[in-house]
């Protein structure tokens, strides 16, 4: 049985010494009580030595985890001083004081950091106890004003655990109903399953009082009962009275005291030590299955985390080489999966992957950037008009000059360089993010990660430069030759016949299909109408609708997209909103939404706004183009030219440019993503798979590159310690035989027959610190002296006859509830009690019924026998 306590001590030491916090509540006994209640004295009596600090005020200022182990030699060990044995218990006391002051200071401060002390002695039973600070009311020294609450919280930190037994220490010379220890225990253990009562200072009670009712578990009963002890007095301590002599004096006190001699074998420090040993052993046995389950769960969690650490040896070069190869292979698979996409088991459902973001750049952002660079209709016609007139010069042209078409188209094609270069920059930026994410698993080796990122980034930058050259070369190809014989080109004949309401550049007939859904905020709603708030928007090729939420059941409004354009909204410096805003508006100035000229929409980030703009672009809503203002009357006169032949030529060139630019932009949107994929992304993937490892070996010393970071080494050691401690703990617990015999927990205390509040004068036992009732005058019998006079009442049951078989109290007269109450109080009180004997009230004697008189005679006779036996026993002892 004691091996169970030893096991828990080993677990406690293993976890504490390794610095492992396993979230396991190991079975222990916490000693709780008020200040100067005698807690430390009880612990010293267990050990048989003076080793705990003493003094006035609060002395125990840190929890002391005391492990008592039965051994051949007598010495102590502290967990914070490993390997040092303290043979002198005076040195142990000094070390406790010094260690307390190191953490809390020397001016009565407190701390919840425990001190672990293990005491080996042939005079102790295996126990694990926690000495906690005593409850105090007033702060002294540098203690905070809420010292009482802090101490309570510290105590609750230990006793609220279901695996902790509570040793509630209460002095006998105080009222048990006001016991701080029992009050705290009641809060966390209302059923009393874990609480053991200890009554100290029994020898200091007032003369004529005793704690028999408490020790017999009749006053404020506990499920595990009370045990009384007698500690050394302050005079004994100052006189260096040996604890063994004190234990002998304690035994003599209980054997000689008339109120305690009948239960002397169930009182005293040795009995308390045996009870605690048995109770703790049983408690450990009951909690071991749950402890094993927690350890197994911890083990399963730790096994996944330490799988890569199990066979790791920091000094082994082969293991480092293997680790490098494994991480490069992991990088290759992660990079490819991020770019190409992953299977259903590994797909990320929280955010877009790098490949998905690059896809959005190709098909949304590039299209949007190209359209932003295009001129609007009015600007384009003005440029065509200038080109035609400048080509003709002083001559009057009879035919539409094709050189004007070529000049305008080249200007439009040259504008494509900026958006395609920006597309390359966006892809490279996203690719750098992907590389950083994929190398995150190399964080254990910061130099390796840094070198890997440097090599890959350098290669990507080189490919970026090459890709930009090739893409600009594609634009130069378009500038070098105008293929007016293209099958999709409209031609001069069709251009002249085309109406001026021809399709605008880049438009597509999509039908009324849904293009995008998502949340946006309408910014320009008035305060009286609810202010800005988020809505669920549905964008189609013909309209945009918004709903209250994504269920799309309550539609707020539907806005047609015909003739609308986009513009950015700049937030003023007084604006409190940090959201990015854009607006839908009509170029002709009509109201767009109710009384509003524009509908202002906002998103959280710039990326979201740009994505929405690209979606609007697919629906045919283009960004606003700022018109350049010309100065002078010449510009006004040029723009107001009304030459019908020039207007026809402008319209023809306009249709030709529109048709040819559709071909060029279509080719550009198709070829740019292909060039980026081949020259950057696929090349980077091939580089990582085929050349990265060689560059790493050539870059420097692999031993330095594979040095662990301090954080990773600390975490690895901690994880391995936790894993080994958990594994050892499971092995220790697994070796325990669960066939041990334990005493069952006592049944719950039944006191429902007691009157509420114990206020009945016949049944109410006195408090330990109170004075028992003084004897009243002898009652006169109405039978003329047939019966002997009643003895004065002592207010308690009669003393027991020594060495009676069973050690219990004498048989009680029948008729009492449960047969376990003390005899009724004799008629010495002027209280109006009825049916007890002859009661004197207002000078008149009243007779007692015959049946009750017989019971009184029987009790009196038994009391006389007991007193005679006690006197005889003490005389010839």
Swiss-Prot record:
Chain positions covered by the region annotation G2 motif: 59-61
Catalysed reaction equations from the record: GTP + H2O = GDP + phosphate + H(+)
Domain of life: Eukaryota
Region (G4 motif): 200-203
Plastid recorded as keyword: no
Chain intervals for the UniProt region annotation (G1 motif): 33-40
Main location class: cytoplasm
Region (G5 motif): 230-233
Impact upon substituting residue 141 to S: In allele shi-TS2; temperature sensitive larval and adult paralysis
Compositional bias per record (Acidic residues), positions renumbered to this chain: 630-641
Entry keyword set: Cytoplasm, Cytoskeleton, Endocytosis, GTP-binding, Hydrolase, Microtubule, Motor protein, Nucleotide-binding, Phosphoprotein
Any one biological process term the GO annotation gives: border follicle cell migration
Entry-linked Gene3D superfamilies: Dynamin, middle domain, P-loop containing nucleotide triphosphate hydrolases, Pleckstrin-homology domain (PH domain)/Phosphotyrosine-binding domain (PTB)
Compositionally biased residues, Pro residues: 788-826
Region (G3 motif): 131-134
Domain PH: 513-621
Misc remark: Shibire mutation is the cause of temperature-sensitive paralysis. This is believed to be due to a reversible block of endocytosis, which prevents membrane cycling and thus depletes synaptic vesicles.
Annotated family: Belongs to the TRAFAC class dynamin-like GTPase superfamily. Dynamin/Fzo/YdjA family.
Name of the protein this chain belongs to: Dynamin
Species, as recorded: Drosophila melanogaster
């Amino acid at each position: 049985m004691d091996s169970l306590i030893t096991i828990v001590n080993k677990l406690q030491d293993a976890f504490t010494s390794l610095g492992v916090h396993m979230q396991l509540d190991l079975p222990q006994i916490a000693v709780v009580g008020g200040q100067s209640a005698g807690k430390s004295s009880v612990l010293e009596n267990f050990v048989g030595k003076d080793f705990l600090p003493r003094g006035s005020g609060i002395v125990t200022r840190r929890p002391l985890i005391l492990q008592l182990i039965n051994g051949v030699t007598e010495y102590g060990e502290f967990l914070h001083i490993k390997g040092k044995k303290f043979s002198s218990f005076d040195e142990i006391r000094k070390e406790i004081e010094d260690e307390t002051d190191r953490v809390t200071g020397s001016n009565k401060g407190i701390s919840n950091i425990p001190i672990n002390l293990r005491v080996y002695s042939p005079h102790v039973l295996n126990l694990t106890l926690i000495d906690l600070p005593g409850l105090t009311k007033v702060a002294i020294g540098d203690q905070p004003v809420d010292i009482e609450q802090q101490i309570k919280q510290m105590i609750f930190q230990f006793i609220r655990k279901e695996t902790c037994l509570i040793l509630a220490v209460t002095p006998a010379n105080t009222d048990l109903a006001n016991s701080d220890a029992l009050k705290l225990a009641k809060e966390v253990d209302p059923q009393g399953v874990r609480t053991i009562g200890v009554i100290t200072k029994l020898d200091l009670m007032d003369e004529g009082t005793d704690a028999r009712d408490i020790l017999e578990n009749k006053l404020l009963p506990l499920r595990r009962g009370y045990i009384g002890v007698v500690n050394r007095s302050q005079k004994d301590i100052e006189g260096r009275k040996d604890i063994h002599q004190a234990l002998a004096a304690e035994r003599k006190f209980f054997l000689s005291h008339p109120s305690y001699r009948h239960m002397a074998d169930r009182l005293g420090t040795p009995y308390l030590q045996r009870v605690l040993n048995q109770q703790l052993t049983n408690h450990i046995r009951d909690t071991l299955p749950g402890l094993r389950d927690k350890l197994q769960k911890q083990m399963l969690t730790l096994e996944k985390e330490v799988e890569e650490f199990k066979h790791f040896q920091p000094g082994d070069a082969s293991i480092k080489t293997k680790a490098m190869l494994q991480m490069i292979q992991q990088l290759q698979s992660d990079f490819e999966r991020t770019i190409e996409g992953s299977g259903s088991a590994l797909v990320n459902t929280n955010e877009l992957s790098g490949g998905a973001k690059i896809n959005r750049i190709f098909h949304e952002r590039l299209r949007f950037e190209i359209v932003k660079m295009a001129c609007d209709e009015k600007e384009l016609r003005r440029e065509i008009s200038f080109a035609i007139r400048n080509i003709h010069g002083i001559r009057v042209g009879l035919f539409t000059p094709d050189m004007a078409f070529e000049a305008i188209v080249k200007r439009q094609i040259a504008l494509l360089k900026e958006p395609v270069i920006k597309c390359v920059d966006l892809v490279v930026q996203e690719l750098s993010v992907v590389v950083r994410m994929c190398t995150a698993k190399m964080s254990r080796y910061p130099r390796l990660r840094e070198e890997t990122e440097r090599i890959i980034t350098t290669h990507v930058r080189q490919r970026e430069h090459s890709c930009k050259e090739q893409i600009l070369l594609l634009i130069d190809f378009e500038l070098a030759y105008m293929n007016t014989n293209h099958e999709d080109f409209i031609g001069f004949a069709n251009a002249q016949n085309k109406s001026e309401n021809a399709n605008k550049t880049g438009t597509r007939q999509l039908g009324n299909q849904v293009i995008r859904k998502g949340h946006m905020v309408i910014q320009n709603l008035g305060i009286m109408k609810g202010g800005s708030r988020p809505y669920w928007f549905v964008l189609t090729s013909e309209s945009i609708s918004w709903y209250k939420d994504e269920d799309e059941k309550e539609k707020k409004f539907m806005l047609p997209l015909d003739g609308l354009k986009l513009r950015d909204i700049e937030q003023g410096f007084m604006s409190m909103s940090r959201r990015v805003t854009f607006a839908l508006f009509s170029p002709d100035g009509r109201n767009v939404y109710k009384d509003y000229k524009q509908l202002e929409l906002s998103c959280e980030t710039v990326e979201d706004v740009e994505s929405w703009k690209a979606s609007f672009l697919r629906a045919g809503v283009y960004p606003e183009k700022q018109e350049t203002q010309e100065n002078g009357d010449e510009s006004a006169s040029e723009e107001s030219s009304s030459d019908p032949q020039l207007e026809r030529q402008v319209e023809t060139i306009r249709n030709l440019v529109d048709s040819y630019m559709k071909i060029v932009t279509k080719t550009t949107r198709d070829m740019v993503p292909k060039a980026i994929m081949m020259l950057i992304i696929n090349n980077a993937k091939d580089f990582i798979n085929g050349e990265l490892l060689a560059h790493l070996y050539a870059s420097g010393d692999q031993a330095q590159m594979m040095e662990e970071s301090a954080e990773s080494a600390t975490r690895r050691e901690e994880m391995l310690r936790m894993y080994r401690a958990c594994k050892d703990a499971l092995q220790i617990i697994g070796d325990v035989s669960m066939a041990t015999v334990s005493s069952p927990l006592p049944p719950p205390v039944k006191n429902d027959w007691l009157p509420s509040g114990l206020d009945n004068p016949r049944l109410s036992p006195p408090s330990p610190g109170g004075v028992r009732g003084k004897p009243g005058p002898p009652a006169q019998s109405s039978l003329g002296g047939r019966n002997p006079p009643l003895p004065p009442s002592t207010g308690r049951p009669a003393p027991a006859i020594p060495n009676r078989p069973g050690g219990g109290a004498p048989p009680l007269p029948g008729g009492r509830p449960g047969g376990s109450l003390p005899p009724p109080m004799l008629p010495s009180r002027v209280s109006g009690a009825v049916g007890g004997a002859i009661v004197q009230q207002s000078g008149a004697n009243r007779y007692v019924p015959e049946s009750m008189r017989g019971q009184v005679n029987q009790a009196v006779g038994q009391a006389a026998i007991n007193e005679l036996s006690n006197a005889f026993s003490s005389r010839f002892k």
